[in-house]
Regions:
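Positively charged, low-complexity/disordered segments
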Residues: 1-10
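Glycoside hydrolase catalytic-domain context in secreted enzymes
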Residues: 9-403
Length: 403
């Protein structure tokens, strides 16, 4: 679906693949980066070819059928062989067997990890089928070395011609060749589309549909809007945390809510819904509150943002050291307050203790800028009937042990 949205449905028009409102999409990272041993970033995927195809390759088949024009090679290895230098996977499997006509792009200096290569030269990656090398720093040396490698026969000129043909084909299909200047294209400088209401409504819908209800003791959800609700937890009012890594910055850290104009935190969304329903909202990061006891506590917590190797784990246990979030849950539970856990994460984690301490537990993943999408589901409408029901399903198993 996302591929169709990016490239459109004009797949049969070979001389002009995309309409002016569409873009060239990239599928990545080919192949097996989600199956490395122990989940280590840029690690080694130790599986059979059948498992590699059946589990890690299916998404690429669908992407190719839907018109993806570029595919990025992965940093990881397959059974010890770096994919950037794997002729069988890139040339024979991807281009020949899977029929990929676009071009393969390397990842950030990924070629430098291939045996016998470095950041400044890698004939092996080019010969293996990488058509466009990503060289952020040593590009002048890489260019000169590649020319020399063609001249001395390390790289066949037919391989260069194939790479150039593939790149030009994508440019032609996207209308770049012979088309308008970038500054003259239909949507040039149309910044009003960024963060537009229409786009945000789609994002809000995506949040609603991706929520997975893992526990709902005594059918506590959905909550009525006219209650006294405590919203607490370290992520309750943090759009940055609910957006994760690769958000504004590489690691997604150091962001404040002010960096997300018009975005809504989980608290913002709940506050809007509860206030509209005649209820009372209390915000607290540590579970404390003043006044009468809340009718329910919504505790928002989870992973802090990370990207790439910074997210590597030695255990799947959430907060394997200090259980600060679990302590909040236990404190509220001891007071007899019903607890709804909103768990933010980019992956399944072992949270048995947190689930057991909660009356309801929701895997909310990373809802991004539209925290209000969570409130749409966990509260009734003004008629006190279901507003939006939970529809999200786990597409993979949830860990039963921390190892």
């Amino acid at each position: 679906a996302i591929m169709a949205g990016l490239v459109g449905s004009e797949m049969c028009i070979r001389d002009r693949l995309f309409s002016p409102s569409k873009v060239v999409a990239t599928a990545k990272h080919f192949i097996g980066d989600g199956g490395t041993t122990d989940g280590i970033d840029q690690g080694n995927t130790e599986v059979s070819e059948q498992e590699l195809r059946d589990i890690h390759g299916q998404g690429y088949m669908s992407a190719i059928e839907s018109g993806v024009q570029t595919i990025m090679a992965t940093f990881n290895s397959w059974n010890g062989s770096k994919v950037h230098g794997n002729n069988y996977l890139l040339n024979e499997v991807l281009k020949e067997q899977m029929g990929f006509e676009g071009f393969v792009i390397g990842d950030w200096t990924g070629h430098g990890q291939v045996n016998g290569c470095n950041d400044e030269q890698c004939a092996k990656a080019i010969n293996a089928g990488v058509d466009m090398i990503m060289v952020p720093f040593a590009w002048k040396a890489f260019f000169e070395n590649t020319v020399n490698q063609v001249e001395n026969g390390e790289i066949a000129i037919t391989r260069i011609n194939d790479a150039v043909k593939r790149i030009l084909r994508v440019k032609a299909r996207s209308g770049i060749i012979g088309g308008d200047l970038p500054s003259e294209r239909q949507y040039s400088n149309q910044t009003n589309f960024l963060g537009s209401e229409t786009h945000r409504l789609v994002a809000r819908e995506a949040v609603r549909k991706s929520l997975v209800l893992l526990k709902n003791k005594n059918s506590i959800l959905p909550l009525k809007r006219n209650q006294r609700i405590l919203v607490t937890g370290p992520a309750a009012n943090s759009i940055g945390q609910q957006s994760g890594g690769w958000t504004i910055t590489w690691q997604g850290t150091g962001n404040s809510n002010a960096d997300f104009p018009n975005g809504t935190s989980v608290y913002d969304g709940i506050s809007q819904v509860v206030s509209d329903g005649g209820g009372t909202i209390i915000l607290s990061t540590d579970g404390t509150y003043s006044g009468s006891r809340p009718d329910a506590a919504i505790v928002v917590y989870g992973e802090t943002p990370y990207a790439e190797g910074a997210g590597d784990l030695s255990s799947l246990e959430y907060q394997s050291g200090s259980k600060t979030d679990l302590n909040i849950l236990k404190s509220l539970k001891d007071q007899g307050i019903p607890i709804i856990s909103i768990f933010l994460s980019g992956r399944p984690l072992w949270v048995n203790a947190e689930i057991n301490a909660s009356d309801a537990f929701i895997a909310a993943w990373l809802p991004g800028s539209e925290g209000i999408g969570i409130a749409d589901v966990i509260f009734t409408n003004n008629e006190e009937t279901v507003n939006y029901d939970f529809s999200g399903k786990l597409s993979f198993s949830w860990p039963n042990t921390p190892t």
